[in-house]
Amino acid sequence: SMSMKDNAVLGISLGTSMASGYVDPDGRIRPWLNELAFAPVDYDNGATADEWSQDIGCGVQYFSQQAVARLVPAAGIALDSGMPFPEQLVEVQKLMANGDEKARLIFETIGVYLGYSIAHYANFYDIRNVLILGRVTSGQGGEIILQKADEVLRAEFPALSESIKLSTPDEQQKRHGQAVAAASLPSIG
């Protein structure tokens, strides 16, 4: 929020799991948990079950390394099914860097999931900005995820598309963001 010079920010990290944080329109961090990893984004009875919570349709299954690994066979990519999720992500990102269309489908699918989920999150959060980050968004795949999410918002939720800006941290935000936030913390004691 500080480096963006705006508030009403929902930050979503797509990595080993899914993490999130929210800064309200007044620049405050609210006193509730923003545990979107276990909030449902797929309400279909056949949605993917989360191995930890046992719930179906949880965000973590759609916005993390697990999502990439789950989509690998559906995209027709042959990887060892016993390969750890981080390694599968790296392999898919390598394929994407080489222009592989099957890898592209994985990131497009995650982007579609994200577009619909942002619209769903907007039912609960006053959002002007969505900041997407994490290992899954590294490289060209992250750009594709944002493009597809934006396409979904424009096509299905045009009013939200006009009011919500999607972004990833630029290099300065990555390098200086934590230091700026830490320097702004009040002293305790």
Indicate where each model-derived feature is located.
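ATP-binding/phosphotransfer module of carbohydrate and carboxylate kinases, centering on a glycine-rich
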Residues: 2, 10, 45-189
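Eukaryotic endomembrane system proteins
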Residues: 21-40
